[in-house]
């Protein structure tokens, strides 16, 4: 049996701006300037949606995506704001299974909580998974603190004051790759891994390097099912669900998780294809009561053990 996961994690990379007379050409950006954006779909666990004011209007519901450094708005929002799309201004978005040049638009302001951005270029899509008005990437999150209360269904973005975790919370030290991407060190069983924390992904993904290391310990891991990840232009990429031993990230221990393993394009874009790596999605993060991402402390704080089905 094959499970179809439509756009489970469309990790898109905005790598250039197209300008010209009518038909733009897209220029590649240097490696250090690459920007990521990942649309989100509805899931059983939940999504993190923030109310966002754009050009003084709104609020618009945008999905907070820590795997995206580039924000995205829908065509519906463009129309509501009375903005004009110019055919010679585009962003090239690379997905898990392909790439697509999409229109871009300049925003005067984008505001939510302590996040205030001005003169911001964003990509425009016809729709966003989950019915949101857009995707809130983490561009400009330096020095901020994101607090998500899953019990009260609240998200707040404030200036970090360097607060430590509460007495009943665990912590996961993080590193910032490309300046904004949250990467933590951990273990899957006895295997050391790099894990990307991605609130825009429904399902946790693993790369081939981790899969191969697990299958060499076959008594601990068993392939369960095929999976198809459908990306841009309906291009598909195949992976395998594998029952995965305990994942340990900082003080968090995650048991009983089935992870999709494949030659996932986003690991290559992140430079993580040659070492065991995970992309930790909302199937794990959404099982928390409280999640705090402190970009100044470079730390993740969480309440409660992970309650996975």
Where are the regions a protein language model picked out?
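Pepsin/retropepsin-fold aspartyl endopeptidases
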Residues: 18-309
């Amino acid at each position: 049996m094959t499970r179809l996961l439509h756009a489970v994690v469309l990790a898109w990379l905005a790598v250039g701006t197209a300008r010209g007379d009518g038909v733009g050409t897209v220029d590649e950006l240097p490696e250090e300037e690459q920007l990521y954006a990942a649309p989100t779909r509805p899931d059983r666990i939940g999504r993190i949606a923030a109310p966002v004011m754009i050009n003084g209007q709104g609020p618009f519901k945008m999905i907070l995506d820590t795997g995206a450094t580039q924000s995205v708005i829908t065509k519906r929002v463009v129309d509501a704001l009375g903005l004009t799309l110019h055919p010679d201004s585009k962003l090239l978005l690379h997905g898990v299974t392909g790439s697509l040049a999409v229109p871009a638009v300049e925003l005067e302001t984008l505001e939510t909580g302590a996040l205030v951005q001005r003169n911001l270029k964003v990509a425009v899509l016809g729709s966003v998974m989950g019915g949101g008005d857009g995707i809130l990437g983490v561009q400009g999150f330096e020095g901020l603190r994101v607090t998500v209360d899953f019990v009260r269904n609240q998200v707040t973005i404030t200036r970090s004051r360097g607060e430590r975790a509460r007495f009943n919370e665990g912590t996961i030290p993080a590193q910032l790759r490309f300046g904004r991407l949250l990467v933590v060190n951990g273990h899957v069983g006895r295997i050391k891994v790099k894990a990307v924390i991605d609130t825009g992904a429904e399902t946790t993904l693993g790369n081939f390097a981790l899969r191969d290391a697990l299958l060499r310990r076959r008594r601990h891991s068993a392939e369960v099912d095929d999976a198809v990840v459908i990306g841009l232009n309906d291009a598909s990429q195949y992976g395998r669900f594998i029952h995965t031993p305990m994942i340990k990230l900082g003080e968090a221990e995650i048991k009983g998780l089935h992870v999709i393993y494949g030659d996932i394009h986003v690991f290559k874009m992140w430079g993580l294809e040659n070492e065991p790596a995970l992309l930790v999605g909302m199937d794990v993060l959404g099982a928390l009561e409280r999640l705090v991402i402190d970009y100044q402390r470079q730390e993740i704080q969480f309440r409660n053990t992970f309650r996975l089905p």
